[in-house]
């Protein structure tokens, strides 16, 4: 049985994909839970129209994210922190701290969008990625200086 996916389904496909699945899987799982609908001729035409509309929306999102990325490329964030011996901080600089500083500079970036593997615990200059969109990942400079 062929179905059109409404949502991404692991190991099956992305929204708008037409996939072939067993009738039981479609009737008992995918369709009742709203993950897919039957691939009739009318639904195929509708999905073609929706794909073009979604593609236009996605292009707008990418353009907006790229505009923010261009502004972020010029931004640096500075933290003045108390330092112990060997340049180690008392505490650390986290994604929440960076997001708060960016918000103070007029950017609406959530802490989960900031790509920092572990909190910063030493003095220095760090390049930190910001995930604005799946295709747009600008980097900002984070300066950690002695207070």
From Swiss-Prot:
The keyword Ribonucleoprotein applies. Pfam families: Ribosomal_L9_C, Ribosomal_L9_N. Belongs to the bacterial ribosomal protein bL9 family. Keywords: Ribonucleoprotein, Ribosomal protein, RNA-binding, rRNA-binding. HAMAP family: Ribosomal_bL9. GO terms for biological process: translation. Binds to the 23S rRNA. One of its GO terms (molecular function) is rRNA binding. One of its GO terms (cellular component) is ribosome. This is Large ribosomal subunit protein bL9. PROSITE patterns: RIBOSOMAL_L9.
